[in-house]
Every structure is written in C-alpha cells, then in structure tokens.
C-alpha cells in the first residue's frame, strides 16, 4: 500500500482478503488490477474486489499481457470441463483429508471452489518490456509468453525494489507437462525467461 494503492492478487476469497486488508490499511478504493497471466486462480477473484460498473465509472486500469482473453477463454471455457475432471486426479482433490494432512501436488494444498469471474483488460502489455504508472506507482512489465502460462508477464516496482514473478519461478515447474491437459510448455524457452529476469530485473 502506498497512499491509495493496494496490490491484490488472486470472488469470495478475494473479497475476504480485501476486507481483511481494509481492517488494517483503511477503506481505500481499488485503483488498479493486474492480471499476470491467463490461469483462473490469478483472475477468477476479480469481481470480489471490483465490479465492472465501478471499474468503468472510475476508469480503473485493468492490466494484462497480450493474448490474455484468448488464452483465458481457451483454457477455462472451451477446455475447462475436461481439464477440471483431469485436475481432480492431478490435485488428488477426492483423497481424504484429516488432522494428519492431505496429499497434494506440491503447488497448492487445495483449489478454491467459489464463484469465478473476469473483467476484460483495459490495458494490454504488448511489448517485451513496457513501463506503466498505476495510481502513482511505477510498474515495469516484462512479457514471458509460453512460460508457466501461454499469456504471462512478470513485473518490477523499481522505486520499491520489488519484483512480482507471477509463476515464472516456482519450485514445481508444474506446467512443463501437466496431467490436466493444458498446453505443454517449452522448457528451454521457460528457462531463458528465468535467465532474462535475473539480468533485467534491477531490485
């Protein structure tokens, strides 16, 4: 949070997170949304923090990488039913849970099952590197398509010496070949994006 800004990532869960933040930071308006990539767990909570009417009335920037809507539609609408069935096996979601734990795939302990929604981007990041001011905060976005998601970007906040890696770097590299049937990623290209992030990000 800086003045009126809060960066919120990921409908019920997002609303609860925002309500919790406002208890401690004050009832500040959401002044921008950044969708780092086309996977539902990174945009599905949008309507929990911002309505379409409010976004339009206040001209709230909704930022996403080029190709975001096409890839979000392809994976979550066209292929969603089949991929959801397969994901049950991938995540072990039907396995028992108890006080001793739960079997998971190393990426997340559980998948949220609330309502999802989407807001169309108003700003597309279509250059390899692109700077943008969002309510007084300077962002520098770097496109990394075909890494963890078909449409993905990472960002740095140079004035705050911070870096948002989205899912470019994770200990599982879970989408090199995913059992749920998402597009297979190019491992070499993904590794090059990680190398580029190391050399380009000045924090």
Language-model-detected regions and their locations in the chain:
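Metallo-beta-lactamase
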Residues: 26, 63, 69-145, 189-194
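Active-site beta-strand termini and strand-to-loop segments that position acidic
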Residues: 1, 134, 155-159
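Active-site-proximal beta-strand elements of phosphoester/diester hydrolases
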Residues: 2-5, 138-144, 162-167
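Active-site metal-binding motif and surrounding structural segment of the metallo-beta-lactamase
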Residues: 10-61
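Active-site environment of divalent metal-dependent phosphoester hydrolases
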Residues: 38-44, 69-72, 148-149, 170-174
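Divalent-metal (often Zn2+) His-rich catalytic cores of metallo-beta-lactamase-fold enzymes
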Residues: 131, 156, 162-163, 172, ...
